[in-house]
A protein has these predicted regions:
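Short C-terminal tail/terminal secondary-structure segment
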Residues: 151, 238-239, 250-263
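Conserved glycine-rich cofactor-binding loop
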Residues: 13-15
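Active-site helix of classical SDR
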Residues: 122, 162, 170
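Residue(s) in the substrate-gating loop at a strand-loop-helix junction
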Residues: 146
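Substrate-binding pocket helix/loop in short-chain dehydrogenase/reductase
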Residues: 98-99, 103-111, 219
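Short, small/polar-rich loop/turn modules that mediate ligand/substrate recognition or access, typified
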Residues: 178, 183, 249-251
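Alpha-helical segment proximal to the catalytic Tyr-Lys
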Residues: 127, 175-176, 247
Length: 263
């Protein structure tokens, strides 16, 4: 389906990023796995090789908030596999605090990881992606945002602001690149079974005295299906946006939330 397309995925060591890596590997992509933990990336690469024996995979550790780190990782990736054809900006971080206790350091951290990181990665891969698109290989940029990019949630104001920024960046860049063979879209998952949600559960437990089951139910309650979204469901949506026939899907922010935003 996507044979030999070079896909670079940030936050690829676990959760949604790992699920996306598997989907794209099964579709025939060559993969560059990026993240801060080399051990997690190595473990994920070994898991991919076990499930997709012929996968071509490179580990390129990076901190998306560090421009030099991003450019070094992208240079390494392009030296191995050529221009990046599919960029999945998945790296993210959430931290909850009342706005009055959200200091400038926390605010900047949330923007740096969740918004500026996407900017850094797009800046680094775009020249090569555009060159490849001009030669007939379409480019895809998929930003993993959040329902927090489409609505508000209390006590995560910095995260919400950053994810709204990702949605805005997606729309603006989609228009800019619309005639250049590159599409830009955002996937906006609701609460998903990931490390971020597990940390949120522990935070609820420690601050409210609720049981873990009660905390998970509190997060699931926003989903009309009364459950957490699964990483594989997000990954399937990414594959759809990258596959043949998706050229007209551009500048969209697609909620994967069981209908949370429908009401």
């Amino acid at each position: 389906m996507l044979n030999n397309r070079h896909s670079l995925i940030t936050g690829a060591g676990a959760g949604i990023g790992a699920a996306i890596a598997l989907q794209l590997a099964q579709a025939g992509c060559r993969l560059t796995l990026c993240g801060r933990s080399q051990d997690k990336l190595q473990a994920q690469a070994e898991e991919l090789r076990a499930q997709v024996p012929d996968v071509a995979v490179l580990i390129a550790p990076m901190d998306v908030g560090d421009e030099q780190s991003v450019h070094a990782a992208v240079q390494q990736a392009q030296a191995r596999f050529g221009p990046v054809n599919i960029l999945v900006n998945n790296a993210g971080q959430a931290h909850s605090a009342p706005f009055a206790k959200t200091d400038a350091a926390l605010w900047q951290q949330m923007l740096n990881v969740n918004l500026t990181g996407s900017y850094h990665c797009i800046q680094a891969v775009l020249p090569g992606m555009l060159e490849a698109a001009a030669s007939g290989t379409p480019g895809r940029i998929v930003n993993i945002a959040s329902t927090a990019g489409l609505k508000g949630y209390a006590y995560v104001s910095a995260y919400v602001a950053a994810k709204h920024g990702v949605v805005g960046l997606t729309k603006a860049l989609a228009l800019e690149l619309a005639r250049k063979g590159v599409t830009v879209n955002a996937i906006c998952p609701g609460y998903t079974e990931t490390d971020i949600v597990r940390e949120a559960v522990q935070n609820i437990v420690s601050k409210t005295g609720k049981s873990e089951a009660e905390a998970r139910q509190a997060l699931s309650a926003s989903n009309p299906q009364q459950r957490l979204v699964q990483p594989q469901e997000v990954a399937q949506s990414v594959l759809w946006l990258c596959a043949a026939g998706s050229d007209a899907i551009n500048g969209q922010s697609i909620a994967i939330d069981g209908g949370e935003l429908a009401g």
